[in-house]
Amino acid sequence: MAKFLDAVAGFGVTFASMFKKHVTEEYPEKPGPVAPRYHGRHQLNRYPDGLEKCIGCELCAWACPADAIYVEGADNTEELRYSPGERYGRVYQINYLRCIGCGLCVEACPTRALTMTNDYEMADDNRADLIYEKDRLLAPLLPEMTAPPHPRAPGATDKDYYLGNVTAHGLREAQRAGEPR
């Protein structure tokens, strides 16, 4: 008799859930909410004037435990400027076949160029399409942004960009008036 009661107790969860109302997830038509800090697809961010935040330092690639990131830096010139600093990430690739979504690359980035979005739909039937190049990772240009390459905002320094003093229309008014930086 004790063995029978043990078997009934073992199936207690099963029996309890058999008589509950079923919940249907309508996933493809109505995606559910994700947590605000969900680690989804990566995004390379831009400054308000359109220049890229990535300086090609390769710290994200060094921090990646899965070796999923490849960065090749190049030097900026005054004629062809992609970021406000001396360098920019000429080649940037993330291999989502290897990425484990840990976010260590985001923590390692000194300019906050790399963030993770809430986009989780990255499935594909072609392995080559899961290696995201820079053009798929860059944040879209907003209407007031200018596509790089273009010169820095007039009178702006690297420090102005990193402190957030540059807007889509140039330096903030307080900075032009001569307030200390």
Curated annotation (Swiss-Prot):
Keyword Iron-sulfur applies: yes
Keyword Iron-sulfur: yes
UniProt binding sites for [4Fe-4S] cluster 2: C64, C99, C102, C105
GO molecular function: 4 iron, 4 sulfur cluster binding; iron ion binding; NADH:ubiquinone reductase (non-electrogenic) activity; quinone binding
Subcellular location: Cell membrane
GO biological process, one term: aerobic respiration
Subunit structure comment from the entry: NDH-1 is composed of 14 different subunits. Subunits NuoA, H, J, K, L, M, N constitute the membrane sector of the complex.
Name of the protein this chain belongs to: NADH-quinone oxidoreductase subunit I 2
Gene name per UniProt: nuoI2
